[in-house]
Swiss-Prot record:
One of its GO terms (cellular component) is cytoplasm. GO terms for biological process: ribosome biogenesis. Residues 332-356 are annotated as: Disordered. Monomer. Residues 1-159 form the Obg domain. Mg(2+) binds at S173, T193. GTP binds at residues 166-173, 191-195, 212-215, 279-282, 308-310. InterPro entries: G_OBG (IPR031167), GTP-bd (IPR006073), GTP-bd_Obg/CgtA (IPR014100), GTP1-OBG_CS (IPR006074), GTP1_OBG_dom (IPR006169), GTP1_OBG_dom_sf (IPR036726), OBG_GTPase (IPR045086), P-loop_NTPase (IPR027417). Pfam families: GTP1_OBG (PF01018), MMR_HSR1 (PF01926). This is GTPase Obg. An essential GTPase which binds GTP, GDP and possibly (p)ppGpp with moderate affinity, with high nucleotide exchange rates and a fairly low GTP hydrolysis rate. Plays a role in control of the cell cycle, stress response, ribosome biogenesis and in those bacteria that undergo differentiation, in morphogenesis control. It is found in: Cytoplasm. Belongs to the TRAFAC class OBG-HflX-like GTPase superfamily. OBG GTPase family.
Length: 356
């Protein structure tokens, strides 16, 4: 299934049905009186968060959704039928924005959550409604009210417990494939991962969801590379695992490049708990490894973990530390406080330092 995390959609609720002008006509009843029924209510446009979806690809091929119009009233006090509503199904984690792409209308966070995006128009009154002691035979009825219409943006943000960040070719996809059943594309060239990937990880009996997003490069917030739009998928994460390639030219500079892009994106990403790990330690000699570790430690102001996604060295320790942070931090909390003792006791769990 193709991945799509943003779609523009047009929705229109149903118009209300018209009221009816009718009179009772029966044998031997000279003045039967009005009996025109009311129009039916138009259908709503409803959006529902469902389980089992992780893409908005369906809305690439169909962008227009219209609910059914309410039925017109008829004689013998028959009211029009209500219009059938339209239900748009989206993944959990989807946000609805107005046409300006900035005004948040609703955020879906739980399975089964429903939101009425456009209400159907009310049906018009038939002439029976207007009967009164002074007007025994009204000859007018109301038309149905028009429905609502609008353009909206659907934007999906994956719901994961932990997120993998780093430069392209930092080994994020290899790490994800090592610790979960996910099968991301792995190759020795930049931007192998073009879309976010999810994997379920089991660390000593504790399960959590890990998200791998495409790599960031310098200037990503200005559109370089694949840009930084995929960072939205780690906004809901409780902890970030920052992988730095031990074979790169300078581990400290690589770390700061990603940090700068996180700051430029915003979204409280820089306030999240971060675990820093030096990856691909099997591909460098001991002297170079020590040099890169020291560079990364100075840049991050914390002692990095040493891991290898290829051989599995240090991977279990990294998963345990991720699980520890996730178990301590509720889903609703987006950032770890600097006063939290759990964050200050362990150097790998300290909040991200401010960058000049």
């Amino acid at each position: 299934m193709k991945f799509l995390d943003e779609a523009k959609v047009y929705v229109r609720s149903g118009d209300g049905g018209n009221g009816c002008v009718a009179f009772r006509r029966e044998k031997f009843i000279e003045f039967g009186g009005p009996n025109g029924g009311n129009g039916g209510r138009g259908g709503d446009v409803v959006i529902e968060a469902v389980d089992g979806l992780n893409t908005l690809i369906d809305y690439r091929y169909q962008q227009h959704f219209k609910a059914q119009r309410g039925g017109n009233g008829s004689g013998k006090d028959c009211h029009g039928a209500g219009g059938k509503s339209v239900v748009l199904k989206v993944p959990v984690g989807t946000q609805i924005f107005d046409e300006d792409r900035e005004t948040l209308i609703h955020d879906f966070t739980t399975v089964g959550e429903r939101f009425v995006l456009a209400q159907g128009g009310n049906g018009g009154f038939g002439n029976a409604h207007f009967k009164s002691p002074t007007n025994r035979a009204p000859r007018h009825a109301n038309p149905g009210q028009p429905g609502e219409e609008r353009w909206i943006w659907l934007r999906m943000k994956l719901i994961a417990d932990a997120g993998l960040v780093g430069l392209p070719n930092a080994g994020k996809s290899t790490f994800l494939s090592k610790v979960s059943a996910a099968k991301p594309k792995i190759a020795d060239y930049p931007f192998t991962t073009l879309h976010p990937q999810l994997g379920v990880v089991n660390a000593d009996g504790r399960e959590f969801v890990l998200a791998d997003i495409p790599g960031l490069i310098e200037g990503a917030h200005e559109g370089a590379g694949l840009g930084d739009r995929f960072l939205g998928h780690v906004e809901r994460c409780r902890v970030l695992l920052h992988l730095v390639d031990a074979t790169c030219e300078h581990a400290g500079k690589a770390y700061k490049t990603v940090r700068h892009e996180l700051e430029a994106y915003g979204g409280d990403l820089t306030d999240k708990v971060e675990i820093v790990a030096l990856n691909k330690i099997d591909a460098v000699d001991p002297d170079e490894l020590k040099k890169q570790k020291d560079r990364l430690k100075r840049a991050a102001k914390k002692t990095p973990l040493l891991i290898s996604g290829a051989t599995g060295e240090g991977v279990k320790e990294a998963l345990r530390k991720l699980a520890d942070v996730i178990s301590e931090q509720p889903v609703s909390i987006k950032a770890k406080s600097t006063s939290d003792s759990a964050a200050t006791e362990e150097p790998w769990a300290a909040p991200l330092p401010p960058q000049g």
